[in-house]
Amino acid sequence: MVFGEFFHRPGQDEELVNLNVGGFKQSVDQSTLLRFPHTRLGKLLTCHSEEAILELCDDYSVADKEYYFDRNPSLFRYVLNFYYTGKLHVMEELCVFSFCQEIEYWGINELFIDSCCSNRYQERKEENHEKDWDQKSHDVSTDSSFEESSLFEKELEKFDTLRFGQLRKKIWIRMENPAYCLSAKLIAISSLSVVLASIVAMCVHSMSEFQNEDGEVDDPVLEGVEIACIAWFTGELAVRLAAAPCQKKFWKNPLNIIDFVSIIPFYATLAVDTKEEESEDIENMGKVVQILRLMRIFRILKLARHSVGLRSLGATLRHSYHEVGLLLLFLSVGISIFSVLIYSVEKDDHTSSLTSIPICWWWATISMTTVGYGDTHPVTLAGKLIASTCIICGILVVALPITIIFNKFSKYYQKQKDIDVDQCSEDAPEKCHELPYFNIRDIYAQRMHTFITSLSSVGIVVSDPDSTDASSIEDNEDICNTTSLENCTAK
């Protein structure tokens, strides 16, 4: 019995309300229920028709004036105690989620939970929310992995209706799945090596040995490396495009767009260099050429095709725009506040480099992100105190959303690994067709046929299993040995 029920004794003039909750019957005073008119039982007493009553309870007996509720009777004892005492108490053995649903059904607010149980209730509720979030994230990751795997299977099925479907299928799998076979791994390693060689050549080309007053010097070796890399990139993109099962989906893939963007600067620069004009636009074209050459750095994004981590990072940033927005908002507020504070205490000092609020913006940015280049710094005591506060606030502000983003990155990284494993497991049956096939049953049948034929050739007939004696068994063994020896000699 819950505390509060034992001490309550209704008066003789008070009208009782008969309640039946899952077989637990209790008669309660109307005045007790009307203390909380916004709850379900309080609203029940204000109903003027049977239809309105049945909207609040599961059944109603007119003869007995009994209201029936198909709810948990053990939890209703705590609800009933609330009407007597005005406070909710949560026992240690109760399920927080079930208790929350129960009081929500009866229309009781969580604010009525007594202070002795409120902290424990909120802590356990937050723990359940965190577990649910982790489970939902894992389920979403698993479901999306299965969805992408099923899409991969559908893409493979499209090749059956295409021209040169089998050839295009083999090429497409080897280009898209480096773990498929040895040739696919060699293609992936070659593509990765070409990307790195192109980036190294671009960086070496910017060194002072390859510069003069007029601009860059065309080194034949670096130019040859550049042409070879572009030829590889162009051929790779053309092969992918030719083998793709759907051209429209091909151009919707971000990795394919990156491949296309990485080769545009070379051909655009080549077109600008071959154009002969004797006007003032030549100088502008030279600037365009320099910009296009700098765009070659986008080739490094091609590494995402061969890196699970880079693909996971892109998916994390794409699905964490809310957390990234919060991070930028926190930093913006902190930068605005501390830049004005540092400017107000440093502006009167002639030795300070913080002479304007825009400069203070830069100082606050590198301070809150704990970079601290040292090009601008406060010189007064008040400025140093503000700088210390700025750095501490920056550490706290940056750390809050980063944890959530890191957890999402872990989930998406595991998701990408699951997708790769699923694709490898789906490709395994196709690899098995290339291996030699042996059927043990057929081999056994062939051996038995050879054995019976050898018995027939020497005139031995087995008529009755019970008539077999030791001498016949020895003869059979000699025949078997002779037959196996002849088979080995024939082989």
Curated annotation (Swiss-Prot):
The record ties this protein, via CDD domains, to:
BTB_POZ_KCNS3 (cd18428)
List the SUPFAM superfamilies: POZ domain, Voltage-gated potassium channels
The GO annotation for biological process reads:
action potential; potassium ion transmembrane transport; potassium ion transport; protein homooligomerization; regulation of potassium ion transmembrane transport
| Entry keywords, A to Z | Cell membrane, Ion channel, Ion transport, Membrane, Potassium, Potassium channel, Potassium transport, Transmembrane, Transmembrane helix, Transport, Voltage-gated channel
Ranges within the bilayer without spanning = 358-369, 370-377
Q: Which residues lie on this side of the membrane: Cytoplasmic?
A: 1-182, 244-254, 307-321, 414-491
Give the GO cellular component terms, alphabetically.
cytosol; Golgi apparatus; membrane; plasma membrane; voltage-gated potassium channel complex
Q: Which domain of life is it from?
A: Eukaryota
Keyword Nuclease (UniProt): no
Does the record's keyword annotation contain Lipid metabolism? no
Q: Selectivity filter: where is this motif?
A: 370-375
The record places the following residue ranges in the Extracellular compartment, namely: 205-220, 276-285, 344-357, 378-384
Record text on subunit structure and interactions = Heterotetramer with KCNB1. Does not form homomultimers.
UniProt lists the family membership as follows:
Belongs to the potassium channel family. S (TC 1.A.1.2) subfamily. Kv9.3/KCNS3 sub-subfamily.
Task: Please give the function described in this protein's UniProt entry.
Answer: Potassium channel regulatory subunit that modulates the delayed rectifier potassium channel activity of KCNB1 by namely slowing down the deactivation and inactivation time constants. While it does not form functional channel on its own, it can form functional heterotetrameric channels with KCNB1.
Kindly provide the name given to this protein in its UniProt entry.
Answer: Delayed-rectifier potassium channel regulatory subunit KCNS3
